[in-house]
Amino acid sequence: MNAKKDNQYYGKYFEYLVACILNKELPCLSAEQWGVAGEDGLVIKKEAHEVATFLGPHRCFHTGLHTGNADADLVLDDGQTIELKRVSSGSGTYYNTSIYHMMKYGFDFKDYLREFGLYDALKENFSDLSISEKNNSPVSMADSSKIRHQFATIYTEKICPIDAAARSAFVQDLRKHFIENLDDFYCFVSDMLYKQSLTSHKKKPDRIIVYNYKKHTISEINLAEIITNLSTYSCQNTDTDFSLLAGPLRFVFSWQNGCGLNNPTIRTFLR
């Protein structure tokens, strides 16, 4: 159940049902209207009942139904903001923002793309497309899709290795900088925890509720404890070239729409 491509729709339907159950309302929109297929809708309804019971007797406002840039998914009648995660493992993405936030610490990702020859490789192999060295993304979303689906072999052999080398060097330099400059490191971790970047200003939720649909378990992440212990974290090595660790946090430097092509990001995960 629940292929990766369906996660967004299934997750939103899950939020919607939790809100309906808390508010003692019948759902106005069917599972099919949310893009949820077959018996999956019945399964998600059962899961939503479990989470609503976990949250207790509250009314709520479903912020996710009204804006895609909300600070949380639900606001309870006592003012608590709730972020809901429906996952097969881990706890889902806590925060997603532009990699260009790192310019705050003197690191411009475009310098690495230029140094390792990504722009040159794109121009050489896709001369009929618009390649930008000024924009944050080398190509548009539409062209990214075209490259990945119509020219998969060229993309895999000519572009992906250059991006991997550039990102690896970027993250290694960041790690070295943060180890040598702890104030910058703690500032960065705080920015991600409080969801405050140069390009995206949100608010952290009061509570994060995680439903694991494979294990059928509910857990709550203690965000306050993570923040309290912030000064005890160190910048650690990881098992990949593209991420940093800080205590229970993992920061992954990747791309939203095709590696080396469109929307380079920082994703924050709580372990």
Identify the role of each PLM range.
Residues M1-A72, L76-Q80, K85-R271:
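Short, positively charged
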